[in-house]
């Protein structure tokens, strides 16, 4: 069943817009960050991870973003090229801005934290002049990340991408992706999140992220009230995530589809959301039934929280299907389905 119609004649399946960074994950885990001495370097940032995830799943992917004019910027561009992601709309920062850096701390499978360096960074220098209408016209969907809205000029660039997408019939997916860095206050968050949320076709976010988006609209909404609100604005799918308690997708026909996490031996408690998003979007692009798309996303998320990296360990279609098969053989057919 198709919940959203995509223009199948377009060159790209998906084009994320916004944050790209470098992740440093410790190899000497189960220590506080102050004591870790050895790290592996990976591509990071939710839009970038989603781009890699969908490329691994066989989709034609582009990217709109800005990187540092240095070796880290080269690393990003070369990594994208290796994954088959189009880099023609990735530009270099002109005033010495650096790529965002993220250091992770893995104290235990359930206790992880993230330290981000987000001042004077390249991705927030994305400008309206960097947004090309023909590029957006040639993709089935764009993904706008909430972090792109945190500061100007990236904020205006993201809003231009949104307007051009609406003008040209390009599907808009809003990945709320809240990070406290760079925002001035909660009112600012609510204003810009709601601007994009009201114009999107799909919104994906945690309960806490929806609370931030609704900060100037309503307080203490239930999931059902939140879903109805954003569906009434025109969204076709609203996904509300509750971490270890699973997630629910709401659709315009009034239905709610619930999925649980797959049981897996955790290595870390971060990174699953980007894998979930890429695999879920894949299912929607393929026209799958909602429960199948959610199950695919949940399986991909489970695989990522059991691995060391985010981008590097994004799975293929075959790997996710094999994971689901093994999980169902061990735990039963309804292991993740509510």
From Swiss-Prot:
Function, in words:
Catalyzes the phosphorylation of 5-dehydro-2-deoxy-D-gluconate (2-deoxy-5-keto-D-gluconate or DKG) to 6-phospho-5-dehydro-2-deoxy-D-gluconate (DKGP).
Per the UniProt entry, what species is this protein from, by scientific name? Answer: Clostridium perfringens (strain 13 / Type A)
First-tier enzyme category under EC: transferase
What catalytic activity does the UniProt entry give for this protein? 5-dehydro-2-deoxy-D-gluconate + ATP = 6-phospho-5-dehydro-2-deoxy-D-gluconate + ADP + H(+)
Transmembrane regions: none
| Pfam families linked to this entry | PfkB
EC number(s) stated in the UniProt entry for this protein: 2.7.1.92
InterPro entries with a match to the protein in the record: Carboh/pur_kinase_PfkB_CS, DKG_kinase_firmi, Myo_inos_IolC, Myo_inos_IolC-like_sf, PfkB_Carbo_kinase, PfkB_dom, Ribokinase-like
Q: Could you list this entry's UniProt keywords, alphabetically sorted.
A: ATP-binding, Kinase, Nucleotide-binding, Transferase
Single GO BP term: inositol catabolic process
Q: What does the similarity note say?
A: Belongs to the carbohydrate kinase PfkB family.
Record keyword Phosphoprotein present = no
| Metabolic or biological pathway, per its Swiss-Prot or TrEMBL entry | Polyol metabolism; myo-inositol degradation into acetyl-CoA; acetyl-CoA from myo-inositol: step 5/7
One MF term in the entry's GO annotations: ATP binding
Q: Does the keyword Nucleotide-binding apply?
A: yes
What is the protein's given name? 5-dehydro-2-deoxygluconokinase
């Amino acid at each position: 069943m198709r919940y959203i119609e995509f223009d199948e004649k377009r060159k790209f399946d998906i084009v994320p817009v916004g944050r790209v960074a470098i992740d440093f994950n410790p190899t000497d885990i189960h220590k506080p960050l102050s004591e870790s001495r050895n790290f592996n370097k990976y591509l990071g940032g939710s839009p970038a991870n989603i781009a890699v995830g969908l490329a691994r799943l066989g989709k034609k992917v582009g990217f709109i973003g800005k990187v540092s004019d240095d070796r880290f910027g080269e690393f990003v561009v070369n990594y994208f090229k290796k994954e088959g992601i189009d880099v023609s709309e990735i530009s270099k920062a002109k005033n010495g801005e650096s790529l965002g850096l993220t250091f992770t701390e893995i104290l235990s499978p359930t206790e992880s934290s993230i330290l981000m360096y987000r001042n004077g960074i390249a991705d927030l220098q994305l400008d309206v002049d960097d947004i090309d209408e023909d590029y957006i016209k040639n993709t089935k969907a764009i993904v706008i990340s909430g972090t792109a809205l945190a500061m100007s000029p990236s904020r205006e660039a993201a809003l231009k991408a949104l307007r051009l997408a609406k003008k040209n019939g390009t599907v808009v997916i809003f990945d709320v992706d809240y990070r406290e860095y760079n925002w001035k206050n909660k009112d600012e968050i609510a204003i810009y999140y709601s601007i994009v949320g009201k114009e999107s076709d799909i919104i994906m976010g945690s309960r806490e992220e929806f609370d931030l988006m609704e900060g100037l609209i309503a307080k203490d909404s239930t999931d059902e009230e939140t879903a109805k609100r954003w569906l009434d604005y025109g969204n076709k799918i609203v996904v509300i995530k509750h971490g270890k308690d699973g997630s629910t997708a709401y659709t315009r026909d009034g239905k709610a589809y619930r999925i649980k996490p797959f049981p897996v031996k955790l290595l870390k408690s971060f990174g699953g959301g980007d894998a979930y998003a890429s695999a879920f979007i894949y299912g929607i692009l393929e026209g799958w039934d909602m429960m199948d798309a959610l199950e695919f996303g949940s399986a991909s998320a489970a695989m990522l929280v059991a691995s060391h990296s985010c981008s590097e360990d994004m799975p293929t279609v075959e790997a996710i299907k094999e994971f689901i098969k093994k999980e169902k053989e061990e735990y039963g057919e309804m292991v993740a389905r509510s």
